[in-house]
Amino acid sequence: MSYANLEQTIEAAWEERAGISTATTGAVREAVDEALNLLDSGKARVAEKAGDAWQVNQWLKKAVLLSFRLNDMVPIEGGPGSSAWWDKVPSKFSGWGETEFRAAGFRAVPGCFVRRGSYIAPGAVLMPSFINLGAHVGEGTMVDTWVTIGSCAQVGKNCHISGGAGIAGVLEPLQANPVIIEDNCFIGARAEVAEGVIVGEGSVLSMGVYIGASTRIIDRTTGETFYGRVPPYSVVVSGTTPGKPLPDGTPGPGLYCAVIVKRVDAGTRAKTGINELLRT
């Protein structure tokens, strides 16, 4: 089925989604399964760059959501003490052996959870972490311990997502755009990027930086303020903006913001560059 036919079938099914269930067969189920296979293999992405802008393929998000109506809950083996989990989305690695892992070309350390419908590019390293369906992780990227990469989030190549960081998902609300981390970015430990924020290529977010759609991102050098995007090659730390005076004239509480303290330079690259030894 061509992409155009897939999109048409899924869009039509979405309009009639109330009537779709685990009993549904035929073209709708086949289209959703094919869409998930395209996402899983990396042949399609929920978001892709067209020139300087990112384009979101909403129909692929709809396919992911429709799969929850089509697929029933089943036991998933591999729980602690020979127990099982109970879910609708199988592991990406279900049925895999040495042949499949070698062909995929990435490392999956014990304790990482990757749901089917997500794509992991060759050379990536997955420490114990969680990667949700629809997500895309680029070539050579390190996903460190306790990282969460949410549904449909897009992470570029040669990135380092540090321990405990969160890259938020975007299955609801439906029209929301996914979080995008462009190539060669460093996301510090326990940082969080959410609500469709785009982190531009080569940027560095310090430990504990939180950025959502309404977070003020202030360039300390120019005074310029950004919302929803970090310009390429920015070094970002947490900060505060002065609060407005309270009614009695006393200083009001300051508000959180993210501060661009400089642009990436050789010193920054030396501290945050990827270690090729870990990717072999």
UniProtKB/Swiss-Prot annotation:
EC code(s) of this entry: 2.3.1.117
Pathway note: Amino-acid biosynthesis; L-lysine biosynthesis via DAP pathway; LL-2,6-diaminopimelate from (S)-tetrahydrodipicolinate (succinylase route): step 1/3
Ranges that cross the membrane: none
InterPro entries: DapD_Trfase_Hexpep_rpt_fam, Hexapep, THP_succinylTrfase_dom1, THP_succinylTrfase_N_sf, Trimer_LpxA-like_sf
GO CC, any one term: cytoplasm
CDD domains: LbH_THP_succinylT
GO molecular function term, any single one: nucleotidyltransferase activity
BP terms from Gene Ontology: diaminopimelate biosynthetic process; lysine biosynthetic process via diaminopimelate
UniProt keyword list: Acyltransferase, Amino-acid biosynthesis, Cytoplasm, Diaminopimelate biosynthesis, Lysine biosynthesis, Repeat, Transferase
Catalytic activity: (S)-2,3,4,5-tetrahydrodipicolinate + succinyl-CoA + H2O = (S)-2-succinylamino-6-oxoheptanedioate + CoA
Subcellular location: Cytoplasm
Similarity comment: family membership: Belongs to the transferase hexapeptide repeat family.
HAMAP family, alphabetized: DapD
Listed name of the protein: 2,3,4,5-tetrahydropyridine-2,6-dicarboxylate N-succinyltransferase
